[in-house]
From Swiss-Prot:
The gene is psbA1. This is Photosystem II protein D1 1. Keywords: Calcium, Chlorophyll, Chromophore, Electron transport, Herbicide resistance, Iron, Magnesium, Manganese, Membrane, Metal-binding, Oxidoreductase, Photosynthesis, Photosystem II, Thylakoid, Transmembrane, Transmembrane helix, Transport. It comes from Picosynechococcus sp. (strain ATCC 27264 / PCC 7002 / PR-6). Belongs to the reaction center PufL/M/PsbA/D family. A quinone binds at residues 215, 264-265.
């Protein structure tokens, strides 16, 4: 009997690098998507922090009226933001090398484009990295599918909406008050509250919160006791244990009697699929709604839809909402518009039916 020993050829430097990139033994998985994700997210984060603290005012409307967004120019954490790039730039790609100087790039809001482009590439890669790690571990791929909902929402407000409106100045500002301003102006121009897809998104987010609270409270209330009265019940669970840590039959029985039998899940797998799918589908619809409103396919308009026998308008809540929308419309970008299109396009309404008599 002959035994042959063959020494394995040493792996090349590139092969070792590939093995390290795709290794699931690393404390934090890198992956091929991570090779692009890490530098783009670091770039976006660094530029955002610097711009939020120190960026000079930006001529967002393209009318030579800069808007200050950084902390050093008088803002606080609530009012501060990275201001979107100028309407004078429009949809043009505006990297640093396209500007005549760094001052011009800052004045026209170049950092906003730098942040959102790197951020979007980064979150796309994060989603791909979730799939990649699931694949390496032999898991099913639904984690990245769930994350696609916030990715779609971010893409809608940072990319699709500016494309539809024709300028990155219409993108969502990167700050707290800026986000609220974006929401109010969006309502004024697109009536998003009356769009069915936004309604589905509200049902998804609020419903998801409700279902999460219901599930967590039911599980916590039906834990299998493994500890004494003087210990925390959390000590009754050991990571990786095979036994169920709560009694699903008890939880099912409680909820089935609280509402009715078929309102309660008797299958843990279908329950958790439902908990994951409900908010994801809702946010998908909202992102789709924003993406269609980007091209001015707006929410329902029920203004002045009810008339009496004399043809006079009987106001509904839709008309009250429309009054609020017009108020938002006339207040935003005040110096960029001569008059809001929504008001200028309507029929002329006489201020007085007859001239007043003036008695000298």
């Amino acid at each position: 009997m002959t035994t042959t020993l063959q020494q394995r050829g040493s792996a090349s430097l590139w092969e070792k690098f590939c093995q390290w990139i795709t290794s699931t033994e690393n404390r934090i998985y890198v992956g091929w998507f991570g090779v692009l994700m890490i530098p783009t997210l670091l770039t976006a984060t660094t530029c955002f922090i610097i711009a939020f603290i120190a960026a000079p005012p930006v001529d967002i409307d393209g009318i030579r009226e800069p808007v200050a967004g950084s902390l050093l120019y008088g803002n606080n954490i609530i009012s501060g933001a990275v201001v979107p790039s100028s309407n004078a730039i429009g949809l043009h790609f505006y990297p640093i090398w396209e500007a005549a100087s760094l001052d011009e790039w800052l004045y026209n809001g170049g950092p906003y484009q730098l942040v959102i482009f790197h951020f979007l590439i980064g979150v796309f890669c994060y989603m791909g990295r979730e799939w990649e790690l699931s694949y390496r571990l032999g898991m099913r791929p639904w984690i990245c599918v769930a994350f696609s909902a916030p990715v779609a929402a971010a893409t809608a407000v940072f990319l699709i909406y500016p494309i539809g409106q024709g300028s990155f100045s219409d993108g969502m500002p990167l700050g707290i008050s800026g986000t609220f301003n974006f929401m109010i102006v969006f309502q004024a121009e697109h009536n998003i509250l009356m769009h069915p897809f936004h309604m589905l998104g509200v049902a998804g987010v609020f419903g998801g919160s409700l279902f999460s609270a219901m599930h967590g409270s039911l599980v916590t209330s039906s834990l299998v006791r493994e500890t004494t009265e003087t210990e925390s019940q959390n000590y009754g669970y050991k990571f990786g244990q095979e036994e169920e840590t709560y009694n699903i039959v008890a939880a099912h029985g409680y909820f089935g009697r609280l509402i009715f039998q078929y309102a309660s899940f008797n299958n843990s797998r279908s329950l958790h699929f439902f908990l994951g799918a409900w908010p994801v589908v809702g946010i998908w619809f909202t992102a789709l709604g924003v993406s269609t409103m980007a091209f001015n396919l707006n929410g329902f308009n029920f203004n002045q839809s009810i008339l009496d026998s004399q043809g006079r308008v009987i106001n509904t809540w839709a008309d009250i909402l429309n009054r609020a929308n017009l108020g938002f419309e006339v207040m935003h970008e005040r110096n960029a518009h001569n008059f809001p299109l929504d008001l200028a396009a309507g029929e002329q309404a006489p201020v007085a039916l007859q001239a007043p008599a003036i008695n000298g």
